[in-house]
Amino acid sequence: MTRVLLLALIVSGCGREPKAAVADSAGARLEAAAETAGIVPDPNAPLQGSWARDTDRICVGGTDKSARIGVSVDYGEDQGCTASGTVERSGDALKLAFGACRFDARFDGDRIVFPPEIPEACESLCTGRASLAAVTVDRISESRSEASTLRSSAGKLLCAN
């Protein structure tokens, strides 16, 4: 009898779908309020704009799916990197292409983070001991016109069409 009850309980659990999280739950409302207040980054925030931290600068111009991207890393004394290319966004993943230099980066709504290891093809974009590895920048502006003004140390526009 015990075996029959146990078997009935196991079989009765089959085929049931797990409960989906309710969009109007307390947790969902708290998350939405935190995003609105700026406490939690909005992962759906637009990618376009100007980004910076210290001497690292990034510009992004175009649509959210595919856009122009420019990167300037300037440590002075012939130590820096300059790159211009394209970026494709898929959720929080960014696929960057600067000619033969291609890698994935992360985007959380407020920050762009390059991986700690960059392909060898990217070395040609840098001088001295500078690297694109682990570049991390924070949003400065969502303005497309401001992003289009970023220049390399040689004066080249990095996000121009």
Regions found by a protein language model. Give the residues of each.
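N-terminal glycine/threonine-rich, aromatic-flanked beta-hairpin/loop signature
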Residues: D56-K95
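C-terminal partner/receptor-binding element of secreted or periplasmic proteins
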Residues: L125-N161
